[in-house]
Amino acid sequence: MAEIEKLRGKTLLVTGATGLIGSAFVDMLLRANDLDVTVYAAGRNEERARRRFPEYKDDERFHFLKYDVTEPLDCDVCFDYIIHAASNASPNFFANNPVEVMLANINGVKNLLDYGRAHDMQRFLYVSSGEVYGEGDGRVFTEDYYGYVDINSPRSCYPSSKRAAETLCAAYGKEYGMDCVIARPSHTYGPYFTESDNRVYAQFIRNILRGEDIVMKSTGSQFRSWCYVDDCVSALLYILLEGKSGEAYNIADNTSNISIRELAEMIAEIGNRKVIMQLPDDAEKAGYNVVTKSVFSTAKLEALGWRVKEGDMKSKMKKTISRCS
């Protein structure tokens, strides 16, 4: 990946570094052949970081920074780039802790932008979400599209605060001249999710790894764009280095647009299990994303030169499951 050479000699902060996307981004940086780059991997749980990154414990390029994004960042490092990938994407958290979700998404961006502004940061990459689009009208989502979000629903804590955080990036760009770019990943899958992660793909994989049939709590008719995490982080690199300041870019694999039901059947087939239906309880319903169709255009991202890596979704899901087992 020739683009990564542009980071030679740079210092980067990656928040959410023990999460799915953040940790894969750290891997990409540190596994690049002899790349002279300094990476500060920020997260709240040092033990989780030790488990996730054992191969870097003696690597002088790697530093773990214990940090909660809801607080101002207190350190003396001048980061060339900040990649803000910290956000709780668990539907269970949306249902039970909507206040914390909103404050973390908005204040996290503010705290990091304030730090970057005070320390001559070169560029800020905000990892937002495709949930900013809300409920659409059936069209493919381009970056200038915005659908309906019920602002009086507590479940809207996530898309509404992601929208607000994006606007905050734009405001800092306008008022303070800061260089910000935004990524909007589609539903992203890959290994290294936690036992408490209740996103659908993680639930389905845990089912088959335990030798269980996959339990669906809905009809599974919701239609989604998906992206393998390695493809997602390669897209983040293009956005970081080639994206236009102030712009947002969708991330998705356009060969991986399937329904939740089709996803369940794919994972069940890989694990030689069945899919069974079960009614959800009220708490589970409260965390559901009500959007029925969420398909992304990636034309803007591809114009930067990015392409999805070879392999279909089933082969990448097999790789995910084998790395989880």
List each language-model region with its residue ranges:
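Glycine/proline-rich active-site loop of Rossmann-fold NAD(P)-dependent oxidoreductases
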Residues: 163, 179, 188-203, 212, ...
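Amphipathic terminal alpha-helices
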Residues: 1-8, 36-37, 311-325
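Conserved Rossmann-fold NAD(P)-dependent oxidoreductase catalytic core, especially the SDR/UDP-sugar
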Residues: 84, 103, 110-155
